């Protein structure tokens, strides 16, 4: 059986009712770049990871960076 890795960034974004352009604005990047990062075509920078973690922690307080990105 194949392991399925859940994309938590995408799942949290959708659960919070956010559109890609809204998260791109939080990260100060283009929507195209955010979309590539969410699809794991391009990696989030460390600064972007921290920004996302801090944003999501407002709603999911027990989330940690290792669980979110690795």
Locate the predicted segments by residue.
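Short alpha-helical DNA-recognition segment
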Residues: 17-36
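Residue-level detection of the helix-turn-helix DNA-binding "recognition helix"
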Residues: 11-14, 28, 39-41
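A short, Lys/Arg-rich alpha-helix, primarily the initiator
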Residues: 1-15
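A general lysine-centric signal
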Residues: 8, 36-37, 49
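The alpha-helix within a helix-turn-helix
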Residues: 13, 24, 53
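Short amphipathic recognition helices of helix-turn-helix/homeodomain-type DNA-binding modules
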Residues: 64-70
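DNA major-groove recognition helix of helix-turn-helix/homeodomain DNA-binding modules
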Residues: 47-63
């Amino acid at each position: 059986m194949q392991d399925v890795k859940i994309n938590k960034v995408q799942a949290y974004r959708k659960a919070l009712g956010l559109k890609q352009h809204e998260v791109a604005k939080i990260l100060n990047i283009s929507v195209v770049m955010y979309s590539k990062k969410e699809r794991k075509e391009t990696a989030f920078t460390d600064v972007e990871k921290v920004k996302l973690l801090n944003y999501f922690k407002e709603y999911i307080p027990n989330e940690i960076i290792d669980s979110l990105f690795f």
